[in-house]
């Protein structure tokens, strides 16, 4: 089965052949009055052969594309042993594969997959975006990494349209406030994966996290994976004693050292001033420490 890169490479070759044929036509046009019949015949043969080769190559690519489209519609998704091993090593690496082709991952602990309609803003207008939402559990034979993710709570993956204006690196606002704490390159992916946690994690011990990554063949669509549920809205407003860590190192006045409040002060400021979304947190005021 041809990959997207192979088809793109073949199309570049076809376009190169077409441009070469056009150059031959222009060359013949400029020297047409002076060419003898023998030379004219040779030039015409070369032009015809060039365009004929490009035509045949293009027909072959269209046949491959049509056959793969028909195969994907009629054939169920089959997981090879190599893909199963890859999913065990990095479960998030194969999520795009399942979301795109609608495969069932019941053997990996998935309980349900369903389609939902999301409204996404695209250049000032609204359009319907069909998103595949995957709710996952965990199997008894999962790896240690999968068991750790089970402890983080319910997992949900959704596809959302990327912003076309403003800071296009940020996913659309989902009515929660987030702090980015990491980013890494993923094997087999063109775009890095960003990691976010709830802004109120330190203050309210909120466990909600999410991962954001662009799709390989559609850079204008984000795959967002949510882990855990927000508990910060169920908590009461913090008091001065609860906002300050119990183990704050306080030195005497003569030492000249100040009190280190750390991230708790930053999170308290987020609550006091209110963050409007993922792009409006207090990172611009307070420096961000290394993620835990």
UniProtKB/Swiss-Prot annotation:
GO cellular component labels: nucleus
InterPro entries: WRKY_dom (IPR003657), WRKY_dom_sf (IPR036576), WRKY_plant (IPR044810)
Annotated region described as Disordered, given as residue ranges: 133-155
Keywords: DNA-binding, Nucleus, Transcription, Transcription regulation
GO biological process: regulation of gene expression
Coiled coil: none
DNA-binding region: 167-235
Kinase among keywords: no
Subcellular location: Nucleus
GO MF entry, a single one: sequence-specific DNA binding
Similarity section: Belongs to the WRKY group III family.
Task performed by this protein: Transcription factor. Interacts specifically with the W box (5'-(T)TGAC[CT]-3'), a frequently occurring elicitor-responsive cis-acting element.
Protein name as catalogued: WRKY transcription factor 55
Annotated organism of origin: Arabidopsis thaliana (Mouse-ear cress)
Lineage, uppermost ranks: Eukaryota, Viridiplantae, Streptophyta, Embryophyta, Tracheophyta
């Amino acid at each position: 089965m041809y990959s997207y890169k192979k088809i793109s490479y073949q199309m570049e070759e076809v376009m190169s052949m077409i441009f070469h044929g056009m150059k031959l036509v222009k060359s013949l046009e400029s020297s047409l009055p002076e060419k003898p019949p023998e030379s004219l015949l040779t030039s015409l043969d070369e032009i015809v052969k060039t365009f004929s080769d490009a035509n045949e190559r293009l027909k072959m690519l269209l046949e491959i594309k049509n056959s793969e489209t028909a195969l994907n519609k009629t054939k169920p998704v089959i997981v090879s042993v190599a893909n199963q091993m890859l999913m065990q090593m990095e479960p998030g690496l194969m999520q795009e594969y399942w979301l795109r082709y609608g495969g069932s991952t019941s053997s990996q602990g998935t309980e349900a997959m369903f389609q939902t309609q999301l409204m996404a803003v695209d250049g000032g207008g609204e359009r319907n975006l069909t998103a595949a939402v995957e709710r996952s559990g965990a199997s008894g034979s999962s790896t240690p990494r999968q068991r750790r993710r089970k402890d983080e709570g319910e997992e949900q993956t959704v596809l959302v349209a990327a912003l076309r204006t403003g800071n296009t690196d940020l996913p659309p606002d989902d009515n929660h406030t987030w702090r980015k704490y990491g980013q890494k390159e993923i094997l087999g992916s063109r775009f890095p994966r960003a990691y976010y946690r709830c802004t109120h994690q330190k203050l309210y011990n909120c466990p909600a996290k999410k991962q954001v990554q662009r799709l390989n063949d559609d850079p204008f669509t984000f795959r967002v994976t949510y882990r855990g549920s927000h508990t910060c809205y169920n908590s009461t407003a913090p008091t001065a004693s609860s906002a300050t860590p119990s183990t704050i190192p306080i030195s005497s006045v003569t030492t000249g050292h100040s009190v280190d409040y750390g991230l708790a002060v930053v999170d308290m400021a987020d609550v006091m001033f209110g963050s409007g979304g993922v792009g409006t947190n207090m990172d611009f005021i307070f420096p961000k420490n290394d993620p835990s």
